[in-house]
Amino acid sequence: MNKEEMNARQKKIRNFSIIAHIDHGKSTLADRILEQTGALTHREMKNQLLDSMDLERERGITIKLNAVQLKYKAKDGETYIFHLIDTPGHVDFTYEVSRSLAACEGAILVVDAAQGIEAQTLANVYLALDNDLEILPVINKIDLPAADPERVRAEIEDVIGLDASDAVLASAKSGIGIEDILEQIVEKVPEPSGDVNKPLKALIFDSVFDAYRGVIANIRIMDGVVKAGDRIKMMSNGKEFEVTEVGVFSPKATPRDELLVGDVGYLTAAIKNVGDTRVGDTITLANNPAEEALDGYRKLNPMVYCGLYPIDSSKYNDLRDALEKLELNDSALQFEAETSQALGFGFRCGFLGLLHMEIIQERIEREFNIDLITTAPSVIYHVNLTDGSNIVVDNPADMPEPGVIESVEEPYVKATVMVPNDYVGAVMELAQNKRGNFITMEYLDDIRVSIVYEIPLSEIVYDFFDQLKSSTKGYASFDYELIGYKASKLVKMDILLNAEKVDALSFIVHRDFAYERGKIIVEKLKELIPRQQFEVPIQAAIATKIVSRSTIKALRKNVLAKCYGGDVSRKRKLLEKQKEGKKRMKQIGSVEVPQEAFMAILKMDESK
C-alpha cells in the first residue's frame, strides 16, 4: 500500500465507544450496530454478543473490554472502517474505561428516555471530555411507555452542557434509529490523527491471556505500523518481545499482515504474563523506539482488601491456582498467602472496589468450584507511629497496639448521588450516619437532584450501596472517586470468644461508633454461634478495654434425674461434679465459628 492509499484509508477510519449507565441499553445497541453493518448474520446473533463471560450476561454488565472492526457503506457511497470499543460502565473499572476512551476519537452517549442521566453516565462523560472525544448523544428506549425524550434532551443540555438538538431518538431493542447513529458517526467523529512514517506508538487498552498463544494485547495504533516479526518494546518496563501475529476482531479474531496508524486490533508476541502488558502502556519498536510514551498510564492499586479462605482446607492449592489464572487476565487483582487461627490457610486479596471483589469471588466459586469463606472487606490505612515512622495496614489484624500509634489516616471518596427529590432527606441522613461531609447539592431539573458528599471509603465498602438502594426504593444512582487520605479517630476492635481473640473477626471502627458497633456484633454472634457444652463469653474489646459482653449459656444435662428424693448433699455433690467437668471443658474447649458469623460483620448496620 503506497502512502496516498494509506492516507485515504486513514480518512475512512472512525474509532468510537459507547458510554452508558448500567441497563440503559449499551450492549443491545452494540448488538444492533453489529447486525446493521453485516458483521454477523441473524443466525449468529445472540444478545450481548460482546459480553462473552456468563457473569456479564447474567448481571447485564460489561466487565472485560472488547473491540470490533466493522465495515459500513454510508449514504455517500463510501465504505468506512468502524472500530467499536466496548467499555465497562461500572465505577470499579474507571481506569479501563479511561484507557479505552483514549483509543477513540468519538463516543456515543446512550441515555435512557425514561430514566434520564445517572451518576455513572456523568462520570464516564467527564472521562470522555478529558480525552477530547466528540460526543454523540443518543436517547434510547423511546418505545417505552414512560419515555420522555424532550425532558431527557433538556437534561443532557443542562447537566452535561452538550448540544442535544440533533440527538438521535432510538430504540436499540426494536432497531429504530440505528442507521441515523451510523451516519452521525461518519459525519461527526473525527478521523484518527497520527503519522504512519513516525516510530510505532501503540496504546494497550486491554489484554487477555490465552493458554496457547500467551497474552493477546488489544491495541490502538497511534503512530507508525506494526507487523508480525517486528521486535517490540514496552515503554513502562523496557521488556522486549517478538510479534508472532497481528490482526483485528471482526468480531472473531482475524489475522492481518500489518496494523496501520488508526487501526484497533490485537497483537500476540509469546508474552507469558499479563503484568508485562499493563493497560495504558505504550508499545514501540525496539530498534526504532518512540521518544516518549503516550501519557495517562498509571499502575492500578487495589482500594479494597479481604481474606479469601477455602471452606474445605484441602482445596488451598486449588484456590491458589484459581487466583493465579484470574490474575493472568486481571492485572489489578493482587493476592498473597496468609494464615488465620480461626480460618486456617487462605489469601489476602486486593481489589479495585466492591463489584470487582464480588465478581472475583463468584468466578472462583463457579469456574473453579471452590466454596469460599470471605472476611469483612477493609481499606488501606496509613498509620503514623510515635517513633516517627509510617506503616500501611490493609488487614485489621495487623493494626499495631494503640500505645505506639500517633495518628491513623483513612481514604476518603467524593460520592455523587443522583436521586428524585422526594428522597433527598433519606440520602442525607444515610450520608450523615456514614460520617459524610456535605459538599454541594444541585437540582438537575424539577424532579432530580445531584448530592455530593465526602465519605470515608471504609463506610462505603460495607453496605452503603444496599442501604442507598433500599432507602430510595432503588431510584438512586451512585458514583465515587478517591480524593485522598484524612486523619480520623480510628480504633481496632477485637472480638474474643471464650477469652481468645478471633483474628478474622477484628475490624477497624471510628471511636464514636465503637460502643454501638461492638454491642450489635456481640448480640449477632450470640444468635449465630451454636450453644456448646460449656458457657461461652463473647466480648468486644478495644485494646484491653471490654466495651460489650454477652454469654452463650451452656447446654446441660439434668444430672439429678436419677435422684428420687434423697439427701440434698447427694444432689449437691452431683451438681458440683458437673460444674467441675464444665470448668475443665471450658479451659480446653474451642468454639466453632460458622460462616454466618463472618458475614454478620458485613451486615452490621442493618440491625440499627
From Swiss-Prot:
It catalyses: GTP + H2O = GDP + phosphate + H(+). One of its GO terms (biological process) is positive regulation of translation. InterPro entries: EF-4 (IPR006297), EFG_III/V (IPR035647), EFG_V-like (IPR000640), EFTu-like_2 (IPR004161), G_TR_CS (IPR031157), LepA_C_sf (IPR038363), LepA_CTD (IPR013842), LepA_IV (IPR035654). One of its GO terms (molecular function) is GTPase activity. SUPFAM superfamilies: EF-G C-terminal domain-like (SSF54980), P-loop containing nucleoside triphosphate hydrolases (SSF52540). Belongs to the TRAFAC class translation factor GTPase superfamily. Classic translation factor GTPase family. LepA subfamily. It comes from Listeria welshimeri serovar 6b (strain ATCC 35897 / DSM 20650 / CCUG 15529 / CIP 8149 / NCTC 11857 / SLCC 5334 / V8). Its main location: membrane. It is a peripheral membrane protein. This is Elongation factor 4. Keywords: Cell membrane, GTP-binding, Hydrolase, Membrane, Nucleotide-binding, Protein biosynthesis. Residues 11-193 form the tr-type G domain.
